[in-house]
Amino acid sequence: MSNLKNLTGPLSANNPVIVQILGICSALAVTVKMEPAFVMGLSVMVVTAFANLVMSLLRNGIPSRIRIIVQLVVIAALVIIVDQFLKAFVYDVSKQLSVYVGLIITNCIIMGRVEAYALGNKPWDSFLDGIGNGLGYAAILLIVAFFRELFGSGSLFGIQVIPDSWYIANGGFYSNVGIMLFPPMALIIVGAIIWVHRSFNKDLQEK
């Protein structure tokens, strides 16, 4: 049950983005299209899971005064590995993500889970916690990217889903909502998701 909670809790009840309000900056940068959002979410999940695993394995041998430095070194090493992997196998997406892959090092979700969970729990539990929080983060990125790409470009994962015949230029009634491609719309969509989520979860509402 504990393992299941580690995986499913961050998807909704304890989501790192819409409940803990962490990792918001990525929602602006990489959610114009679903493909880079998916790759960024997957990258953060891998880094979070393995950072948790490594730090949980090392937790009893690290002096508390240097633990932050060790955490940063571990996270940075994992991010470099992920970055090189993306450049080798999905170069086009890597170019779209640009510097934002490197900025995973500064993602509050990763450091937060290492500090709050991995340093006090067993390796396997910590690994699952990282997977769960990564999935929760990726889910929000994909939801935001879904609306931005669909209404801003008329496509999903780069595939046109709104028929050309619908567009005004072809005698139809529809026109892409260009404002959806601007960064502020990502925050507005995240805000809407938070509002809907809290409306259905009374425990999260402030008294």
Where are these regions (language model features)?
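Structural signature of hydrophobic alpha-helical transmembrane segments
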Residues: 34-50, 70, 94-105
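Hydrophobic alpha-helical membrane-insertion segments
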Residues: 130-152
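Cytoplasmic-side transmembrane-helix entry/capping segments in multi-pass membrane proteins
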Residues: 62-75, 96-102, 129
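Short amphipathic alpha-helical coupling elements at transmembrane boundaries
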Residues: 6-9, 56-60, 125-133
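Hydrophobic core segments of alpha-helical transmembrane domains in multi-pass membrane transport
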Residues: 24-28, 44-49, 76-83, 105-109, ...
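Short, membrane-exposed interhelical loops at transmembrane-helix boundaries
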Residues: 157-179
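Transmembrane alpha-helix boundary signature
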Residues: 81-96
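C-terminal ends of transmembrane helices
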Residues: 51-64, 111-121, 198
